[in-house]
Regions:
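Helicase-associated low-complexity/disordered flanking segments
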Residues: 1-56, 60-64, 90-91, 245-249, ...
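Non-catalytic terminal extensions of ATP-dependent helicases
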Residues: 2-6, 286-294, 300, 309, ...
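Conserved P-loop/Walker A NTP-binding site and adjacent catalytic elements of P-loop NTPases
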Residues: 44-230, 324-328, 335-349, 353
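Conserved C-terminal RecA-like helicase domain
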Residues: 93-95, 103, 110-119, 278-296, ...
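Conserved segment of the helicase C-terminal RecA-like domain
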Residues: 187, 429, 433-443, 448-489
Length: 863
C-alpha cells in the first residue's frame, strides 16, 4: 500500500531525459488503450490526477481506497468500477450507509444505464434484484453474504460509499463484516472523507483483502472561504465579515481577520452599555476577592445580539450567496426558522419558479398519499414554504417530503434549505453557501462542541463544481462565540477514524454456521477493531519491555546476601495493599448473613497478622544494608505496579474482539442456541441447535431477546395488532433516550398485550444480567412508548388519529413502522419456527407486517 497525494499539474517534460520521455510516451499509449481511457473520453470534463490514478489501479486489479473532501469527485471512481463491470460482463454492487443515499444513487444509475440493468435493495424495497448493477444498503449485502446468496456468484466489484461511516456506533460494524466476508475475487472501492489515520485503515483493508491502493486528494475543486455574520441589534442589517485576513491577491490567509476581532469588541462594548454594565476596575480588584476570578458577585457579561435567522437569509440573498443550506441542530429549530422567514415576508422565488415548483410537487405527490395523510402531515404549510423558496430537511419529515426538497433544491428552485446535520451525510445537495448556526450541539446528554470532522462535513457542501468559483462557509455569531474556535475547526480538515465493531449474538451464530469455532475467532481477529487494538498493544509491548529491563536493574541493585530481597519486597507490597484496601473492599461487599461478614473480616485480620510475621522474620530484615536496599526496593515496587497496570491493558487489547466472541458463545451455549464439542486433543467446536438456526435469521438490535420471547410463548395470546404493538418496543427509539411507557395498554393492564409486554421486559432484564455477568455491554432496553400508537395504526387508524396527542413526527413514525414491518417479516419467513404454534405465529407476523406496511408507510420511496 502506498500513499499518494495529488495536485493538478504535470512534471515539466523538458526536464526529462530521452529515455524517460520515451517511457512516458509508452505509458500514455498504454493508457489510451485502457478501459479507464475509454471511460474518460466521453466525459464533459477532464479527470483530476487522483481520479485517473485510482481508476488505473482498479483496472490493474487492486482494491482502491479514495480519501478526498466532499465535492472533490470521488464518485467518478465508483462510476468507473461500474463501467468496468459492464465492460467485463460481471456484477457490481453499490452500497451506501442509509436508504436515502441508495435511492438517490439508484436513480442516477438508471439515468445512465437504464432501468433494466439497475436494481435496488434496501430491506423494504426490492427492484430488479438480479440486475448487473444493484444499489443497496450495507446491511442487505451483509445478510446476502451470511445467506450465501447465489446473487453473489458473478459479483466482482463492490463500492462502499461513505466508508468512514464504519465509525458509527450502531451501523458501523456491518461495514467491517462486509469487508471481511466478501469473496477474495471481489475488488473493493472505498470512498472516504479525509480522515487522519486513513493509512492505517488502508493497511487494514490490505491485510484482509490483499493489494490495496490508497489515493488521497486534499484539493477542493471549489475554494472555500470562511466568514462570520454579526448583527449589532434587531434594527440594523447583519454584516458578513471574513474569518481570516486576505493576502495581496485577495485570497484568505491563515491569520484571523483583525477587522472581525475589532468589530466583535465594538459589539461587546455596545452590549455592555445596553445592559448598563461597566468594565471591572482591575485596580479595585472587582470580581477578584476570595472567590477569585469570576466570583459570585460578578455580574454576568452582556451578550452580543444574535443575528435573527430571517435577517441572515435576507442578507445572504442580497449578497448573491444563495442557494444555501442553513444548519440548525434541532428539528424544531429548522421548522421555526422556515416559519420565521415566511412571517418576515421573505420571498426568494419568481412567478415562473413558483409555477415549476407547483408542477413538480403535484407530480411527486400524486397517487402517493391520501388527502387525510397529507392533512396530518401539514402538507399545505410545507407546500407554501416551498413556493416561497424555503424548506426544512430533517429526519422528522417523511421520505417523500425530503425527496421533494432535494429535487427542488437540485433544480435551483428552493433557495434556502434549513437542515439538521443528517443532510451532510452524502446526499448530493451542494450549495453556494453553508450557514452554521452554532459551534455546539446537543448529543443526547449535554451540549458538546463540534469536532473538526463534523464542521468539515457541514461546510463541505459549500461550492458547486462547475457553477461557483468560491464556496462560502458562514458561522452565525452566537452566545460564547470566539473567532479562534471557528479557526481551529476550519483549519483541521481531518479527524481520526475509529472502529465501532463488536460481535453480536446474530453475528456469532452466522459465523459458526459457515465455519468452525477457531476459524470464527481468527475471522474476528481480522476486524479493524482488533487491528487498532493491536496497534496500541504494540506500543504497550515496548513499554512492558522497558519496565522489565528497569526491574532487572533494580533487582541487581538490591541483591542481598542474607536472603531473597525480591521476596521480601513482595511481602511488603502485599501487606501494604491489604492494609490499605482490604477493609474498604469488604465493607462494600454483599454477604448473605452476618456470620459470613464476620468470618470474612476475621480471615482478613489473620492474613494481615501472617504477612506481618513473615515480613518481620524474613532474613533480609537483619541485613546491615537494609536501608540502601529499600531505596532500590521502593523503586522496584513502584515499577512493578506500573508493569502490572500496563500488562493488564496489553492483555485487554490483544485478542479482545475474540474474547467478546467467547463470552457471547458462553451465553448462547447456556441458553441452548449452541452446542459445545471438545475432542480428545482438547479442540473446541460449536454447532448450531434449532434455536441457533432461528437466531441466525433474526437481524435486529434485540436479536437474542426476540428469539427468547418467541421461544417462551410470549406472544401466543396476541392477535396481529397486538403482536405489532408489543414488538414496536424493540424498534422504537425515543428521541430523548431511555425507556418509556405507552399512554395506555390496549385491552387494559391485565389484558394480553400488557402481559406480553411485561414478559418481554423480564426477558430483556434477564439477558442484561447475563451480559453484565460476562463483561459485555448491556443491551438497549425495550421502549414501549408508542405501543398504543402502533396498535391503532395496525388496526386501520389514520395517520392523523394515530399521532394525535403525541409529540411524534410523521417521519419518526414512518421510520419506526418500516423497521417494525421488517422485523415482523423476518419472523414470518424464519421457517420453520422451532416451537409449538410456530406456524400460526409466522402467519400472524405476516398479517401484522401487512397491517403495518400500508398507506404512508408503504410509500415506495426509501427512508
Amino acid at each position: 500500500m502506498a500513499r499518494h497525494q495529488h495536485h493538478k499539474g504535470n512534471a515539466d517534460s523538458q526536464t526529462l531525459s530521452p529515455s524517460q520521455r520515451y517511457a512516458s510516451f509508452q505509458k500514455v499509449q498504454r493508457h489510451r488503450a485502457s478501459a479507464a481511457a475509454r471511460f474518460a473520453e466521453p466525459l464533459p470534463f477532464e479527470l483530476d490526477d487522483f481520479q485517473t490514478e485510482a481508476n488505473d489501479a482498479l483496472e490493474a486489479g487492486s482494491n482502491v481506497l479514495v480519501a478526498a473532501p466532499t465535492g472533490a469527485g470521488k464518485t467518478v471512481v465508483a462510476d468507473f468500477a461500474i463501467y468496468l463491470a459492464q465492460e467485463r460482463n460481471v456484477k457490481a454492487f453499490y452500497t451506501t450507509p442509509i436508504k436515502a443515499l441508495s435511492n438517490q444513487k439508484y436513480h442516477d444509475l438508471v439515468d445512465v444505464y437504464g432501468p433494466d440493468k439497475v436494481g435496488l435493495l434496501t430491506g423494504d424495497t426490492s427492484i430488479n434484484s438480479e440486475a448487473d448493477i444493484v444499489v443497496m444498503t450495507t446491511e442487505v449485502l451483509r445478510n446476502m453474504l451470511y445467506e450465501r446468496s447465489t446473487t453473489l456468484n458473478a459479483l466482482r466489484y463492490v463500492i462502499l460509499d461513505e466508508v468512514h461511516y464504519l465509525a458509527d456506533r450502531f451501523r458501523g460494524p456491518v461495514w467491517e463484516e462486509v469487508i471481511i466476508h466478501l469473496p477474495k475475487t471481489v475488488k473493493i472501492v472505498g470512498l472516504s472523507a479525509t480522515v487522519s489515520n486513513v493509512e492505517d485503515f488502508s493497511n487494514w483493508i490490505a491485510s484482509v483483502r490483499g493489494d490495496t491502493k490508497l489515493v488521497i486528494s486534499e484539493h477542493r475543486p471549489v475554494p472555500l472561504e470562511q466568514h462570520v455574520i454579526v448583527q449589532a441589534d434587531e434594527y440594523t442589517e447583519p454584516e458578513v465579515l471574513d474569518l481570516y485576513r486576505r493576502d495581496g491577491n485577495g485570497e484568505q490567509a491563515t491569520k484571523l481577520n483583525a477587522e472581525l476581532i475589532n468589530r466583535l469588541d465594538q459589539l461587546d462594548r455596545k452590549a455592555a452599555r445596553r445592559r448598563g454594565e461597566e468594565r471591572p476596575d482591575k485596580r479595585k480588584g472587582f470580581g477578584r476577592g476570595r472567590g477569585g476570578k469570576g466570583a459570585k458577585g460578578h455580574a454576568p457579561k452582556a451578550e452580543r445580539h444574535t443575528p435573527r435567522r430571517w435577517a441572515v437569509v435576507d442578507e445572504l440573498n442580497f449578497l448573491g450567496m444563495l442557494p444555501g443550506i442553513y444548519f440548525i441542530f434541532s428539528r424544531n429549530g429548522c421548522d421555526q426558522a422556515v416559519e420565521q422567514c415566511i412571517n418576515a415576508g421573505l420571498e426568494l422565488t419568481t412567478d415562473e419558479e413558483v409555477t415549476k415548483i407547483r408542477r413538480i410537487v403535484d407530480e411527486m405527490v400524486e397517487g402517493q398519499l391520501t388527502q387525510e395523510d397529507l392533512k396530518a402531515l401539514q402538507f399545505s404549510k410545507f407546500r407554501f414554504a416551498l413556493e416561497e423558496g424555503f424548506a426544512s430537511h430533517h429526519a422528522g419529515m417523511i421520505a417523500l417530503f425530503r425527496q421533494i426538497v432535494e429535487r427542488l433544491f437540485e433544480e435551483g428552485l428552493v433557495k434556502m434549505v434549513v437542515a439538521t446535520e443528517t443532510l451532510a451525510l452524502g446526499i448530493n445537495m451542494p450549495a453556494r453557501c453553508v450557514v452554521v448556526e452554532k459551534l455546539e450541539k446537543f448529543d443526547g446528554t449535554g451540549h458538546v462542541g463540534l469536532t473538526p470532522g463534523e464542521f468539515t462535513q457541514l461546510t463541505g457542501r459549500a461550492g458547486r463544481r462547475g457553477i461557483d468559483t468560491i464556496g462560502h462557509a458562514i458561522v452565525v455569531d452566537h452566545h460564547g462565540f470566539v473567532p479562534a474556535t471557528a479557526a481551529a475547526l476550519s483549519s483541521k480538515r481531518v479527524y481520526p477514524l475509529h472502529s465501532s465493531f463488536r460481535p453480536t449474538f446474530n453475528m456469532a451464530v452466522n459465523l459458526l454456521n459457515s465455519s468452525d469455532y477457531e476459524t470464527a475467532r481468527v475471522t474476528l481477529d481480522q476486524s479493524f477493531a482488533q487491528w487498532e487494538a493491536n496497534e496500541s498493544a504494540w506500543q504497550l509491548e515496548s513499554q512492558i519491555n522497558t519496565l522489565k529491563n528497569a526491574l532487572a536493574g533494580y533487582e541487581q541493585a538490591f541483591a542481598c546476601e542474607h536472603g531473597d530481597f525480591k521476596q521480601f519486597m513482595t511481602l511488603r507490597m502485599e501487606l501494604s495493599d491489604i492494609e490499605k484496601e482490604g477493609r474498604r473492599k469488604l465493607k462494600h461487599e454483599v454477604f448473605l448473613t452476618d456470620q459470613e461478614r464476620s468470618r470474612a473480616f476475621q480471615n482478613l485480620d489473620q492474613r494481615i497478622r501472617d504477612l506481618r510475621k513473615a515480613e518481620h522474620e524474613h532474613p533480609c530484615r537483619n541485613c546491615p544494608d537494609l536501608q540502601q536496599h529499600l531505596k532500590w526496593g521502593h523503586r522496584w515496587a513502584r515499577e512493578t505496579r506500573e508493569l502490572q497496570r500496563v500488562t493488564d491493558r496489553y492483555d485487554s487489547r490483544t485478542g479482545s474482539v475474540a474474547r467478546q466472541f467467547d463470552c457471547i458463545c458462553d451465553i448462547l451455549t447456556g441458553l441452548g442456541y449452541l452446542e459445545r464439542h471438545e475432542d480428545a486433543a482438547g479442540h473446541i467446536d460449536m454447532t448450531l441447535t434449532e434455536k441457533g438456526s432461528l437466531l441466525r435469521r433474526i437481524y435486529s438490535e434485540h436479536d437474542l431477546e426476540l428469539c427468547e420471547a418467541l421461544l417462551a410463548g410470549t406472544f401466543d395470546k396476541l392477535d396481529a395488532n397486538g403482536l405489532a404493538a408489543v414488538l414496536s418496543s424493540l424498534v422504537y427509539e425515543a428521541r430523548r433516550g431511555g425507556d418509556s411507557e405507552p399512554r395506555h395498554y390496549p385491552g387494559g393492564i391485565s389484558g394480553p398485550i400488557a402481559i406480553a409486554s411485561s414478559k418481554l421486559k423480564g426477558i430483556c432484564e434477564d439477558i442484561d444480567i447475563l451480559c453484565e455477568d460476562h463483561g459485555l455491554d448491556e443491551m438497549q432496553r425495550p421502549d414501549f412508548g408508542i405501543l398504543d400508537v402502533m396498535y391503532e395504526w395496525a388496526d386501520g387508524g389514520s395517520l392523523g388519529s394515530c399521532l394525535y396527542g403525541t409529540d411524534m413526527t410523521g417521519g419518526d413514525f414512518v421510520r419506526t413502522a418500516k423497521r417494525l414491518a421488517d422485523v415482523l417479516q423476518q419472523i414470518a419467513v424464519a421457517q420453520p419456527l422451532p416451537f409449538d404454534g410456530g406456524e400460526r405465529l409466522a402467519g400472524l407476523a405476516h398479517e401484522a407486517a401487512d397491517r403495518v406496511n400500508r398507506g404512508v408507510v408503504a410509500y415506495s420511496g426509501v427512508d
